[in-house]
Amino acid sequence: MSLFFKPVISPQWSFPVLLKIGVRSYAGGPRTKHKGNSPLASVPTGSSNKNRKQKAKGKKGNKKNDPDQAFNFGEYGGLKKDVEMNMDSTNKLIQKISNFDQLLILPPVRDAVKEIISKESLKLQDSRKKTSENIIPSPIQTVAIKRISKNLMDPKLQIHAIAAETGSGKTMAYLIPLIDYLKRQELETPELWETLRKNVLIRSIILVPTHELVDQVYETVSKTKTLLGLNSFKWDKATSYRDLLENIKNRIDILVTTPGKLLNLFSIRMITRPDKVLSKVGFVVLDEADTLLDRSWLEETHSAIKRIPNINHLIFCSATIPQEFNKTMQRLFPTVVPIMTPRLHKLPFALDFKVINSALSPFKGSKIKALAQTLYAISNDDTEPGFEKRCIIFVNEKKNVPEIVNLLNKKFGHNAIGLTGEDTFEERSEKIMPFLSPPRPLSEVVAQSTSPPTSLKKFEIPDSNIVIGKLKNTNSNGTAPSNKSLHVLVTTDLMARGLNFKGVRNVVLYDVPKTSIDLIHRVGRTARMKQGGRVFMLTDSKTKSWAKALPKIIKKHQRLS
């Protein structure tokens, strides 16, 4: 029985059913044992097999017209059948709330939130019209704030799981209740605040799986210093113990770090009572929780949580709910309350998904030629006028990254860099920065092309839904002499989790993802927050049958299963 599928309190309650999707296999990683019986053990299991068969028979005729029917085409990636989601109450709430003024947030926090979102929006190409006056909450922000704020200052432990599609504003969905919680402590309990204000302590913690995510989340959190007077601090690989100690002495309101770093707090000799430093932490968030609770992370993450004795709010946040994550939540945190949006596990509305079969002419089985021609078409079309173009290429195996980068640069004249887990933290930070930053205007980009602009001759690839451009004065291999105006990053799933590639409009899936989880996260690096974006999936004779249905499911708004 799964926590996200059955009611926790009574049969009359019905939490939204959460679909099960395939999960990746991880080597090793101990499982944490959970003592005691889950309160779910006595929950009724629902209809009998006979009733289920009758219901299935009755619905069979309407299968094609069901908008919530999950995509289950082919067997590649171990896709599993979905179940319907009951989202009536969530939909009504989303339709009812049209601005932040309708949400239970302190006025200073509300103003600060609008300012932060407005500044973030101004960094994007098509969001220049947004100001703090017309900023509205996204669906997941509406639902999360409404439900968490209902009992925000209740001292008992409250556990929530926020789950929504990629690029939907999940960071602010948990950050707004967190900030509101801290400011209400100051305003509503002045005596308590007086004991905390000048003490050596940490008040809240945000845990993420990578140091890149530490930097990204901290960039947003740090804006609360000038707007609300909150002291935030990031603890990553570049942070010295001395810097950490100095900030703890001055009170850290929001600490952003990884579970491993947090556990290191107990091995720093200069801190004699690390347990006391964490004793006032009341709000803890696990961002990218499906990663932090998978088999390779579970022991470390669970150990970090257990070191925080007085948690008031524990928030799990994720864009996908894999089966293994669902089981882990049920075992370790059986009272968790799910908060989800109707578009969970659906690909973005604004996504343009194209499938290219490299087995056909003119590529004749060469995926690298199909990739080079796709990049060339991107660099020469009329999209993103006035801005530098960027593209992220995802591969399944890190060993293939150097070879692809070398071929793109030396044989096909592209401007590509590779990034894998073997790079140092400093190298990764330097390589990824141009993609995490807003797109640069072309006036700021140094011209690197070795050939002048040339007119395009278009042709359509057979058995494909993509039109490729071709230069009249190409090299013998059919590519342009140089395509330096397009900045290309070749990487693995290391960079597919949580990172906000600001304004990146193009993603290429060089390999078909192994699971629907990987597909959602890779595709989610573009078309974020209702921006436009394109995904080009390269297939071959083995994977074309599974991939060809993906463009249709986006148009039909179907859910991946």
From Swiss-Prot:
In chain numbering, motif Q motif lies across 117-141
Q: Which UniProt keywords apply?
A: ATP-binding, Helicase, Hydrolase, Mitochondrion, Nucleotide-binding, RNA-binding, Transit peptide
Annotated Helicase C-terminal domain ranges read 370-561
From which residue to which does the transit peptide run? Answer: 1-26
- Classify the main location: mitochondrion
Q: Does the keyword Disulfide bond apply?
A: no
Helicase ATP-binding domain span: 151-339
The terms under GO molecular function for this entry are: ATP binding; ATP hydrolysis activity; mitochondrial ribosomal large subunit rRNA binding; RNA helicase activity
Note whether Hydrolase occurs among the keywords. Answer: yes
**Biological-process GO terms, alphabetical:** maturation of LSU-rRNA from tricistronic rRNA transcript (SSU-rRNA, 5.8S rRNA, LSU-rRNA); mitochondrial large ribosomal subunit assembly; RNA metabolic process
Task: Indicate which residues form the motif DEAD box.
Answer: 287-290
Q: Name one GO cellular component term.
A: mitochondrion
Q: Which residues bind ATP?
A: A164, E165, T166, G167, S168, G169, K170, T171
Region annotated Disordered, chain positions? 29-72
Q: What is its EC number?
A: 3.6.4.13
Q: Where in the cell is it found?
A: Mitochondrion
Function, please?
ATP-binding RNA helicase involved in mitochondrial RNA metabolism. Required for maintenance of mitochondrial DNA.
* UniProt family annotation: Belongs to the DEAD box helicase family. MRH4 subfamily.
Mind telling me what this protein is named? ATP-dependent RNA helicase MRH4, mitochondrial
